[in-house]
Structure formats: C-alpha cells, structure tokens
C-alpha cells in the first residue's frame, strides 16, 4: 500500500489525502473535490498551482504548460504531480462553486447507437448509457472513451446536454493513425459496447454571469460549443450569444440548420461561418459566410470583445491565435475559457 499524505489547499482551506502512487488531481476527484483542470495530461496549464510547502515531483509534462523557470520557482501541474510529504498548495485558478459542488466522476457502460460521418473528417458517435442508465455532466464538459480491448482511452467533448438522457453524442475528428478515430471506419458497429469515464473539464457556462457570450470554434471544437448553445436554448438563458466557426471550405461545415434553429431561442444570436480557403460552396441561405481566418472575422465584428465572455475550442493553432488576439484586445483572463484539442503525439 502506497504511503499517504495530507494536502492543504489555500486560499480555500480544503484538506484531502493523496497516495504517492496517484496524482493530486485524481486524488481530488476521488474525494469529490473538483479542481480546475483541462487536458489532465500536463499540456494545458489549467491546473497550474504553487507549492507553498512540501515535496512534490512531476512526471511527463509539457514545458509549454509549465516551463523550467516556473518549476524552479515552485509551480506545478496538479495532473502530473505526486506528493511525497504533507503539502500546502496555493490554487491559482479555482471556482468556489465547483470545488465541492461538481458532478462526481462516473464509470458508465454504453452501447453504440450510431456512427455517422458529418464531413470528410468529422464523425458523430452516439452512445446510449446502459449501466448506469444515465450519464450526468455539465454542458461543455468531456469524457474519456476507452479503446475496446486495451487499457487506453481518448478524451472527447459531449455535444449533447444532460436533458437528452437516453444518448450522448461526441463529434470526433479523424486523424491518420489515430487509435480511436481509426475505429470509426467500420470497426465500431451499432450495438458495440464502449466504456466511458467522466465528466471532466471546466469549459462550462458560469452561473450568475451576465456578459454576452462569444463562442469561437473549429473542427471537433463544435462539440462543446454545440452543447453550450443547446443548453442556452433549453434553459432560456438571457445572455446574448455569437458563434464564429472556423473551417477551410463550405464542405467542412455541418449542423448548420440545427445551429440556426437553436439560435431562435437564444437572445440576439448570430452565427458566422469563417472559411479560410474559399467562401464558395453551397450553404443554407440564412447562414452568414465570410472568408478569412476565424480570428480575423472575429476582429471585424467584435470591437467590444473585452466586454464579453469568450469560449474557445478547436485545434491548437486556432486557439493560440485567438488567445493572442484576446490578449491584444485586453480581454480579462477570467473572461476567457478554452479547450485546445491537441495532438501529434497524443493521437486521437
């Protein structure tokens, strides 16, 4: 049995136990404490914290998420950190409402309902929760899907909302050599079982916030944003919302009719498809299409973006460009929420 130590989190005054053979983030989940996090693989810095006292060692993390100078100062990524003594840790990023009020992590056995291509490289995977018969999550969160016959998993965002209790939809981008996405080419069949673990992530609408919502997405980043929009439509959320979706061509667009329909129940909703290669091609007449990178289109329309809350989700180059744009336009960091769908070495 691995040795166990006490972790005290400041400034929230929460204490928990952690074993030496588990990382601090997983130990928190196990005890119902929901710390801020993103990728859970040492790549995004969402769980970056500061060690005030104690011995902690990190493993297998990206220096882009926590560089050597930061490590020397005492910064750590909780998803990669193991404690070898009692520790006091300062949380740099936390949501007091979520800390002890998040949704518990669940292990769910699911059955495949449908595998449907949406574009040349985006596939909709719809699963039915079987045991238990319902999967609880917050719109915008993600889950781990376990690769059948292996100990491995891949993480994907839900596109549905909890109100659709009989199925969960994922939008998955196919990558060459991707261990999970390769299964979508005929290897996963209707009726197959897939194990799911979750929910994870902090890419959620914040209760009580009133600023307009600006969503910027690309690729499979459609999934969590679609979940947020579906939730806003279902609940009659009174916040204005705009959605900018970046793609290469019109052939890479999907769910356009549903987005327009959702927008009818969202205050002052606007949707603009941003096409980086060509604005030619057939799209529904009510869809606004502009040529250019998604950040350039946003810049043309959002002169007061510092007075909004921004939700970003998509491939890393798009997210990085958008973060740079938001920083240049003085958008406060606590008004920016993002998921970056990484890869090359972490294939899908």
From Swiss-Prot:
GO terms for MF: 2 iron, 2 sulfur cluster binding; metal ion binding; oxidoreductase activity
Keyword list, A-Z: 2Fe-2S, FAD, Flavoprotein, Iron, Iron-sulfur, Metal-binding, Oxidoreductase
Pfam families: FAD_binding_6, Fer2, NAD_binding_1
Gene3D superfamilies to which the protein is assigned, alphabetical: 3.10.20.30, Nucleotide-binding domain of ferredoxin-NADP reductase (FNR) module, Translation factors
Binding of [2Fe-2S] cluster, residues: 39, 44, 47, 79
InterPro entries: 2Fe-2S_ferredoxin-like_sf, 2Fe-2S_ferredoxin-type, 2Fe2S_fd_BS, Beta-grasp_dom_sf, Cbr1-like_FAD-bd_dom, FAD-bd_FR_type, Flavoprot_Pyr_Nucl_cyt_Rdtase, FNR_nucleotide-bd
Cofactor(s) listed in the protein's UniProt record: FAD; [2Fe-2S] cluster
Cofactor annotation remark: Binds 1 2Fe-2S cluster.
Domain 2Fe-2S ferredoxin-type: 5-95
Keyword Oxidoreductase found: yes
The protein's Enzyme Commission number: 1.18.1.-
Description of what induces expression: By acetone. Transcriptionally activated by MimR.
Domain FAD-binding FR-type: 105-206
Family classification: Belongs to the bacterial ring-hydroxylating dioxygenase ferredoxin reductase family.
Assembly description: The propane 2-monooxygenase multicomponent enzyme system is composed of an electron transfer component and a monooxygenase component interacting with the effector protein MimD. The electron transfer component is composed of a reductase (MimB), and the monooxygenase component is formed by a large subunit (MimA) and a small subunit (MimC).
Function: Reductase component of the propane 2-monooxygenase multicomponent enzyme system which is involved in the degradation of propane via the O2-dependent hydroxylation of propane. Reductase catalyzes the transfer of electrons from NADH or NADPH to monooxygenase.
Protein name: Propane 2-monooxygenase, reductase component
Organism: Mycolicibacterium goodii (Mycobacterium goodii)
Organism classification: Bacteria, Bacillati, Actinomycetota, Actinomycetes, Mycobacteriales
Gene that encodes the chain: mimB
């Amino acid at each position: 049995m691995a040795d166990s130590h006490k972790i005290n989190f400041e400034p929230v005054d929460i204490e928990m136990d952690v074993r030496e053979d588990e990382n601090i983030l997983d130990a928190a989940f196990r005890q119902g404490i929901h710390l801020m996090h993103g990728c859970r693989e040492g790549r995004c810095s969402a769980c970056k914290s500061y060690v005030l006292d104690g011995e902690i060692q990190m493993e297998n993390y990206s220096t882009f998420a926590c560089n050597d100078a930061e490590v020397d100062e005492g910064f750590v990524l909780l998803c990669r950190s193991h404690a070898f003594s009692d520790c006091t840790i300062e949380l740099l990023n936390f949501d007091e409402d979520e800390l002890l009020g998040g949704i518990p992590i669940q292990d769910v056995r699911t059955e495949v309902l449908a595998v449907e291509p949406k574009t040349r490289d985006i596939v909709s995977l719809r699963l039915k929760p079987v045991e238990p018969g319902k999967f609880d999550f917050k719109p915008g969160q993600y889950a781990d899907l376990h690769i059948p016959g292996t100990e491995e998993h891949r993480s994907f965002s839900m596109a549905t909302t909890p109100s659709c209790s009989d199925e969960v939809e994922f939008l998955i981008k196919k990558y060459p050599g991707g261990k999970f996405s390769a299964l979508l080419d005929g290897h996963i069949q209707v009726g197959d079982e897939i194990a799911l673990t979750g929910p994870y992530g902090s890419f959620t609408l914040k209760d009580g916030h009133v600023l307009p919502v600006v969503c910027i997405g690309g690729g499979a980043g459609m999934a969590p944003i679609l979940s947020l929009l579906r939730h806003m439509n279902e609940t009659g959320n009174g916040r204005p919302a705009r959605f900018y979706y970046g793609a290469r061509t019109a052939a890479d667009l999907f769910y356009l009719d549903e987005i327009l329909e959702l927008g009818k129940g969202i205050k002052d909703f606007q949707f603009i498809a941003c096409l980086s290669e060509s604005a030619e091609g057939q799209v529904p007449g009510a869809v606004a299409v502009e040529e250019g990178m998604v950040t350039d289109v946003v810049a043309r329309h959002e002169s007061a973006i510092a007075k909004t809350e921004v939700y970003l989700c998509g491939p890393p180059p798009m997210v990085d460009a958008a973060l740079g744009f938001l920083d240049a336009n003085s958008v406060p960091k606590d008004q920016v929420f993002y998921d970056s769908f990484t890869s090359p070495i972490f294939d899908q």
